[in-house]
Regions:
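Acidic/His-rich structured neighborhood in mature extracellular/periplasmic domains
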Residues: 4-156
Length: 157
């Protein structure tokens, strides 16, 4: 396990041995600190990511070999973490990141971590704008309804 700004990234040993854990951690750091000054660009987003759910556990980015098992999920809860987002070994392809991305070679590290930061950070910190729950009527969900042509229907996305 490593932490980036206090956010736990819990990884199977295969990740650490391959160097992929460092790749994922550096992307998390870049997403939260884009000006590279050593501080999260939006402390409100970081604070909300670090909030413990029900006062007991905090979300973690999980890097399993294949998928998160029930036993692994329970072990994380016992240590004070809960599964927030996963990123499997096969999805992390540093050789295919950035300008090396192609339609047949892509690294999912940015996308999956963006989901994590959005779900636990932006949507909590700025719910009126970035709320993502089914019952939210945030600017984001309204824009999603428009993009998916749900206007005039009582069926929000």
């Amino acid at each position: 396990m490593v932490e980036v700004f206090g956010i736990p990234i819990i990884a199977a040993s295969k990740f650490a041995d391959s160097g992929k854990l460092n790749h994922v951690a550096s992307i998390m750091a870049e997403l939260l600190d884009q000006d590279s000054d050593g501080c999260a660009d939006d402390p409100n987003v970081l604070r909300n990511i670090l909030i413990k759910s029900k006062g007991k556990v905090r979300p973690a980015l999980v890097l399993p070999n294949k998928s998160v098992t029930k036993a692994a999920s329970n072990a994380m809860k016992e240590k004070g973490f809960h599964y927030g987002q996963d990123l499997s070994f096969g999805e992390v392809l540093p050789k295919c990141s950035g300008l090396k991305f192609t339609t047949t070679c892509s690294d999912s590290s940015i996308e999956e971590q963006f989901h994590f930061i959005t779900s636990f950070g932006h949507s909590r910190a700025y719910g009126q704008i970035f709320g993502t729950h089914w019952v939210d009527t945030s600017n984001l969900t309204k824009a999603m309804d428009i993009a998916r042509y749900f206007l005039g229907f009582n069926f929000p996305y």
